[in-house]
Amino acid sequence: MTQPEHNALDGSEQTLVDLGTQPLVNNLTKTKEEALSAERYPLKATIDDNLIIKLSTAVPPDKLYKNYLYHSGVNKPYINHCYLLWHKLKHLKHNTIIDIGGNDGTLLKAFQSQTTDKLRLINVDASTSFLEENRIAHIEYVNAYFNKDLALPKADLIISTNVFQHTSDARKFVEGIKEHLDGVWILEFPYSLNTLKTLQFDQFYHEHYYYWLVSPLQKLFKEYGLHIFNAEELSIHGGTMRLWVTNKKPYASTKAHLSFIKQEQEFNFNNCRSNINVKIIKDTCFLNNLEGEIAYFGAAAKGCVYLNALGITTVTQPRAYVVDDTESKQGLYIPGTGMQIMDRDYLYKNQPDNLIILAHNFKDYIIKSLRPAYKGRIITMFPDIEINMYNDY
């Protein structure tokens, strides 16, 4: 393990979140025994005087992503999000569009389907899993980590949704933006102020090196001649910040980002660690006292963190399992827990008394899709415990 690359902006640090040791969330295993004995790493985040939040230690990428099975194309709320984003951007020049960390090409495919304009679409992604899907969609696939040395064409639009927090060297990433941008960069990331206000400790995991606020980003971008001219807080992914960034002058600033910076400067970060610990204890007590059989929905990273933080395993809940719609995950096991990932048919057949939604950022969509086939209690744990009964349907 190593220290994440430090920004020159870094100041003195204090612990913000400490989740002990956790397994690598995306390294699903083939057996229960492998899952229960999965290697663990410290998971602690610090904050400094410049409001930079980052992990205290970093796990090498070759360990983090050796078995990465996420496909954005199975996420219907995200697909809808992509269509909505296109309608916000279509008035801008968009001949060449680069999507950073574009996965299976879901966003660029959505853009492609909404216009007859001839677009040059480029997906820069470090995974080798999506080459064919992008090729079929006529999307140029650059299999690499994004940086300034890729020799890409200048782009009218660069988009990075839910990826900037994955880089351990924020400066190299921004250098790449400066090199390849000739227009607007749309940057979306989990907004850490909302994460901390709502005690979403499951947003902290090893794949996320940084947990961004607007204030330090404004300073960082300014060093590279980049300027924020708009900011929006979105509900997707449990609370997302969208920044509109440019290296050109024609875009008038809404000043919206300044209100977020003010909120960040006024927020009391000192109580976060203790408040999160209390949340973990309360949730553990609630689940331990829950009557009837329990299953879980959503084999996403946040679900793995949540279960491990609460110490929930097949030892404490022998019949528990996790339901997920991603076919490539089904049959595998959640690291640290020993729980197997099953499909919806298994859930509908067994009808456990309780179903805990781990992917709570999509809870409305998930609940609607489960009813009326599933008739038990559906429970979400964030921001507060909420129980949906079958009679409520």
Tell me the role of every PLM-derived stretch.
Residues 1-77, 232:
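N-terminal juxtadomain amphipathic helix
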Residues 39-42, 50-133, 143-144, 200, ...:
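Extended interfacial segments that mediate partner engagement and assembly in macromolecular machines
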Residues 88-89, 110, 244-393:
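Hydrophobic, well-ordered beta-alpha structural blocks that scaffold small-molecule cofactor pockets
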Residues 135-149, 341:
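Conserved SAM-binding strand-loop segment of SAM-dependent methyltransferases
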Residues 159:
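A conserved beta-strand element that flanks and buttresses the S-adenosyl-L-methionine
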Residues 163:
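Hydrophobic adenine-recognition pocket in adenosine-nucleotide-binding enzymes
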Residues 171-186:
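A short glycine-rich, Lys/Arg-flanked "PGG" loop and its adjoining helix->strand segment in the class I
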Residues 185-210, 214-221:
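Short, glycine-/aromatic-enriched active-site segment of Class I SAM-dependent methyltransferases
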